[in-house]
Each structure stands twice: as structure tokens, then as C-alpha cells.
From Swiss-Prot:
It is found in: Cell inner membrane. Belongs to the UPF0161 family. The lineage of its organism: Bacteria, Pseudomonadati, Pseudomonadota, Gammaproteobacteria, Moraxellales. Keywords: Cell inner membrane, Cell membrane, Membrane. PANTHER family: MEMBRANE PROTEIN INSERTION EFFICIENCY FACTOR-RELATED. This is Putative membrane protein insertion efficiency factor.
Length: 124
């Protein structure tokens, strides 16, 4: 049963993603530029599908398309980061002092929005 669901998710992902690419390559150049948000709804849909999967990504995309009308909002609206997938660990004071003494106390942002976006750009 799990294999069946995984296969359906894979084909739905390919179907929705190919529809977005078709829209970007064929339909979007014909229409005048009128998008109210940055990133555009099609780019938002690609990121939402990549980060959240077929079901949640499609819901985010439908909510975004529902907001994209003359009486709706405008401006910068990025895909929310899936922070629930991160695991946070408590570092004790002794451990942090040890890390500082060894020179390991360097903050490197691997979980921020820019890092995730760069990682996704490398995958596509």
C-alpha cells in the first residue's frame, strides 16, 4: 500500500510540475506581466512542491493563487520554511565553553532561507 501511495505521489508531482513548466514556457510569455507577488505564483508553486511535497505544496499553491487577484494582496511572499523538519539540540554551557575554547564556536547558517534556496537551486 505504501508503494502505491508513493507511486501516485511521484506521478502527481511530475504532473503538477510539468504543468507549471508548461505555463512558464508557453502561456506566460503570451500574457502581459501582471503578477502581484514576488516570487511569481509559478516559481512559488515549484518551491512549495519541492519543499512540502505534492499534497501540502499544492495546498500552498492554491492558497497563493486564491490571493492573487486585484483586491488581494501584493508584495514579497516567499514559501514558508518547513521548520518542523529540523531537529534542535540543546547545547549545555559546559559544551559551549568547550567549543569556544577549541575554536569551534562559529555560527554557520545552513537552515536559513537563503541556504535552503541555494540548495534547491543546485538540485534543479
Amino acid at each position: 500500500m505504501y508503494f502505491f501511495i508513493k507511486t501516485i505521489n511521484k506521478y502527481l508531482y511530475k504532473l503538477i510540475y510539468s504543468f507549471i513548466v508548461f505555463y512558464q514556457k508557453i502561456i506566460s510569455p503570451i500574457l502581459p506581466a501582471r503578477c502581484r507577488y514576488y516570487p511569481t505564483c509559478s516559481n512559488y508553486g515549484k518551491q512549495a512542491l519541492a519543499w512540502y511535497g505534492v499534497w501540502n505544496g499544492s495546498l500552498l499553491l492554491l492558497k497563493r493563487i486564491g490571493r492573487c487577484h486585484p483586491l488581494g494582496g501584493h508584495g514579497i511572499d516567499f514559501v514558508p520554511l518547513p521548520l518542523a523538519s529540523y531537529h534542535y539540540q540543546h547545547v549545555s554551557l559546559i559544551m559551549s565553553a568547550c567549543m569556544k575554547a577549541q575554536g569551534l564556536y562559529v555560527y554557520r547558517d545552513n537552515n536559513g532561507y537563503v541556504a535552503r534556496l541555494n540548495h534547491m537551486m543546485k538540485l534543479t
